Amino acid sequence: MLLGLGGRWAAGLWPGRTRTTWCVAAALRGSGIAFWRAASLAEPERLRSGGHLALAESCGPPGRAQIPVCWEQCVRCFHTQVDKPENGRLIYTGNLARTIFGVKCFSYSTSVVSLAFLPYLLSQNNMMFGSLPLQVLFYGVMGSFTVITPTLLHLLTKGYVIRLYHEATSDTYRAVTYNVMLSETSTVFHQDDVTIPESAHIFTSFYAKTKSLLVNPALFLNPEDYNHLMGYDKPFTFDMEEVDEKKLHEGEK
């Protein structure tokens, strides 16, 4: 084993006094954990003559200790797949998922705090606010922070797609979104179920059956996946009957 590290290192160590310790460096790559290198560390011993420590010499350039290239292939990596195989291939990941989650958590927390202080405020109503307009204004502001704001946030962000998977064999998609309880919910639909709104909507990119979903075309890992999702890769058909009907209606007007 010492001969694999170099003859000069093996000659500098006392016979029978070598201790080899194996360590594996774990590196996080992508969604798995890979074992890449195994290093052999030898305990330095004093030489018989000089009394100095024997330095380990590398297989590469002088003055830089490194592991031989042949050792890098000793330990093969194993990959832990995060996404389940039945989910399909991940084609889209939303970059605002954490932001939406944090904003909704903050809104829910303020609502809970407001509801917790509501009994105390009701008991101190006459002492704090003497006039009726001030009471109406105060409770209106509290109601907006307690009920209206979380509801509005949910209505605006319920269609935001966190992740989108595509199953090529059945041409089905699985869109992951947040529900009202901030847990992930899935919507499975076929490509034929995708309809594009006639007019542009701020919070709707397309409809999957009857549910509106919002995606950012620039965040797709492959632009062809977005084109296939929206049906842009289908051949264009020009129906002459529809054109004749439109001309007929325009002539009647």
Curated annotation (Swiss-Prot):
Localization: Mitochondrion inner membrane
Tissue: Higher expressed in the heart than in the liver (at protein level).
Phenotype reported upon loss of the gene: Homozygous knockout mice for Tmem70 are embryonically lethal at about 9.5 days post coitum and exhibit profound growth retardation. Embryos exhibit delayed development of the cardiovascular system and a disturbed heart mitochondrial ultrastructure, with concentric or irregular cristae structures.
UniProt keyword annotation of Transmembrane helix present: yes
Any one Gene Ontology BP term: mitochondrial proton-transporting ATP synthase complex assembly
One GO CC term on file: mitochondrion
Domain of life of the source: Eukaryota
Positions in the Mitochondrial matrix compartment: 78-99, 157-253
Membrane topology, Mitochondrial intermembrane segments: 121-135
The entry's keywords: Membrane, Mitochondrion, Mitochondrion inner membrane, Transit peptide, Transmembrane, Transmembrane helix
InterPro entries given in the database record: TMEM70 (IPR009724), TMEM70/TMEM186/TMEM223 (IPR045325)
Family label: Belongs to the TMEM70 family.
Physiological role: Scaffold protein that participates in the c-ring assembly of mitochondrial ATP synthase (F(1)F(0) ATP synthase or complex V) by facilitating the membrane insertion and oligomer formation of the subunit c/ATP5MC1 through its interaction. Therefore, participates in the early stage of mitochondrial ATP synthase biogenesis and also protects subunit c/ATP5MC1 against intramitochondrial proteolysis. In addition, binds the mitochondrial proton-transporting ATP synthase complexes I and may play a role in the stability of its membrane-bound subassemblies.
Assembly: Homooligomer. Interacts (homooligomer form) with ATP5MC1; this interaction facilitates the oligomer formation of subunit c/ATP5MC1 (c-ring) and the c-ring membrane insertion and also protects ATP5MC1 against intramitochondrial proteolysis. Interacts with the core subunits TMEM126B, NDUFAF1, ECSIT and ACAD9 of the MCIA complex. Interacts with ATP5MC3, TMEM242 and TIMMDC1.
Name this polypeptide is given: Transmembrane protein 70, mitochondrial
Lineage, highest ranks first: Eukaryota, Metazoa, Chordata, Craniata, Vertebrata
Gene designation: Tmem70
